[in-house]
Amino acid sequence: MSLLTEVETPTRNGWECKCSDSSDPLVIAASIIGILHLILWILDRLFFKCIYRRLKYGLKRGPSTEGVPESMREEYRQEQQNAVDVDDGHFVNIELE
């Protein structure tokens, strides 16, 4: 006898499990853990950028600029922007014939 015929049998309404002893606490706990794991995995995949950025940097927005002259603030902003700008000189264009 195959495993399929031992566990599941076709009925008029669809597939039904013969071993419907779902009152076992271990089965209930495993089902709850499985459902929670699936929900957390889906949320992780949907929001992974937000979640890991928050964990990495926390709620910090950057160093405090309180008491710093405006000219120094602008210089700092410019340095930060230059650090993230892409330098096209580092890329090599390869043309296939």
From Swiss-Prot:
The record marks W41 as: Seems to be involved in pH gating. It is a single-pass type III membrane protein. InterPro entries: Flu_M2. The keyword ATP-binding does not apply. It comes from the Viruses. Residues 1-22 are virion surface. GO terms for biological process: protein complex oligomerization; symbiont genome entry into host cell via pore formation in plasma membrane; symbiont-mediated suppression of host autophagy. A lipid is attached at C50 (S-palmitoyl cysteine). One of its GO terms (cellular component) is host cell plasma membrane. The modification Phosphoserine is found at S64. It is found in: Virion membrane; Host apical cell membrane. GO terms for molecular function: monoatomic ion channel activity; proton transmembrane transporter activity. Residues 44-97 are intravirion. The record marks H37 as: Essential for channel activity, possibly by being protonated during channel activation, and by forming the channel gate and the selective filter. When the channel is activated, one or more imidazole moieties of His-37 probably become bi-protonated. Forms a proton-selective ion channel that is necessary for the efficient release of the viral genome during virus entry. After attaching to the cell surface, the virion enters the cell by endocytosis. Acidification of the endosome triggers M2 ion channel activity. Homotetramer; composed of two disulfide-linked dimers held together by non-covalent interactions. May interact with matrix protein 1. Cytoplasmic tail plays an important role in virion assembly and morphogenesis. This is Matrix protein 2. It comes from Influenza A virus (strain A/Duck/Hokkaido/8/1980 H3N8). The lineage of its organism: Viruses, Riboviria, Orthornavirae, Negarnaviricota, Polyploviricotina. The gene is M.
